[in-house]
């Protein structure tokens, strides 16, 4: 796994602090949404790789 940039580390810290303010149910819903977005991102990357012409 790659290291995070300083900017990414900062964003992650802010994200963690905001998560602490959520209830368990809100956190679970948020986790599912984030995972869905990551899967969509993976699909886009796979599509772009398959359809690239290098």
Swiss-Prot record:
Positions the record marks as coiled coil are none
Tell me if Oxidoreductase is a UniProt keyword of this record: no
* Chief location bin: plastid
- Origin, by domain of life? Eukaryota
Q: Which family does the entry's similarity section mention?
A: Belongs to the ycf18/nblA family.
> Whose protein is this, by species?
Cyanidium caldarium (Red alga)
Entry keyword set: Chloroplast, Plastid
What is this protein's gene name? ycf18
Record localization: Plastid, Chloroplast
Its recorded name reads Uncharacterized protein ycf18
Pfam families assigned to the protein according to its UniProt record, in alphabetical order: NblA
* Statement: the UniProt record of this protein carries the keyword Plastid: yes
* GO CC annotation terms, alphabetical: chloroplast
């Amino acid at each position: 796994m790659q290291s995070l940039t300083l900017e990414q580390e900062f964003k992650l810290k802010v994200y963690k602090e905001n998560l602490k303010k959520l209830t368990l149910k809100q956190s679970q819903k948020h986790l599912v949404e984030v995972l869905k977005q990551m899967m969509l991102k993976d699909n886009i990357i796979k599509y772009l790789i398959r359809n690239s012409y290098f």
